[in-house]
Amino acid sequence: MKALSLAVVAACCAQTALAGDLTVISFGGANKAAQEKAYYAPFTKATGVKVVGGEYNGEMAKVKAMVDTKSVSWDVLEVESPELARGCDEGMFEKLDYSKIGNKADFVPGAAQSCGVGIFVWSTVLAYNADKLKVGPSGWKDFWDVKKFPGKRGMRKGAKYTLEVALMADGVAAKDVYKVLATPAGVDRAFKKLDQLKPNIQWWEAGAQPPQYLVSGDVVMSSAYNGRIANTQKEGKNLKIVWAGGMYDFDSWAIPKGSPNKDAALKFIAFASKPENQKVYSQNIAYGPTNKKAVPLLDKKLVADLPTAPQNIKSGVAVDVAFWADFGESLEQRFNAWAAK
């Protein structure tokens, strides 16, 4: 990592802001649009601090390059849980002072970590275009059945959320996925299952791509983030979600070590953690709030379409953060080598 070129460092610093501005980096798309409405603009109105929003695709190498070279230009960063755990262990993120953020007891279990605060609960689900399929799939096993359901499949270009899906398609129960994946035989089994589908896969890297591929007909079904599909449904597109075998987790706010605006970053995270602001976020994208006090503020019909609804979460898989922190690097390397063949 430390051998990264100055060009990479320059690239990661391209989304900089003027002195005094707060740079917040997210995964973009409908998620960022919801954050702008719920957090960015209201925070600026409340504090006078301008929020400059940037985007990335989760490349921790960029964060490490900035921290190692002491050229940090990002103040607040949206990260997935495995990257939060690994980045915290490796000293890439600041430890958070919860006396300046809020009561840990107000958050759903697992959302208040030493280096990060949960923004929302999301799920990677099976989504399909109901205009293309007269009868929809019922789970990941059907995802692999290209005879019964002809057409391309969209899948995330990475080991995470893809190896789990492969095992469930091969008959592994949701509750046993990580137990199996923690063994060499389980990993081999997942890749063998992916081999079967590889000719029919169209890879996606950004969360905005699956709904685009589904609407255009490039794929007939895809793994996808539930909130992105829900937003496309709001636009009148006939996309459907299968919750069985969905993988749910948090995205969290973290502060890169050496942020030039640490105090303002903490104030922003505290602001974004308030129930009234999380309510606005969930109203704009179908992700569950991490502050439990936000749930009673939401319409009951909306709550039923969130990953946190009991009927949706009961057949899902909680993403095993410790597993991906321990094995993520080696599995991603193997996946990249496999995908390149």
What are these regions (language model features)?
Residues D106, W122-T124, V187-Q196, Q233-S259:
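Periplasmic-binding protein-like
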Residues L84-R86, M221-N238:
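A ligand-binding cleft/hinge motif common to bilobed small-molecule-binding domains
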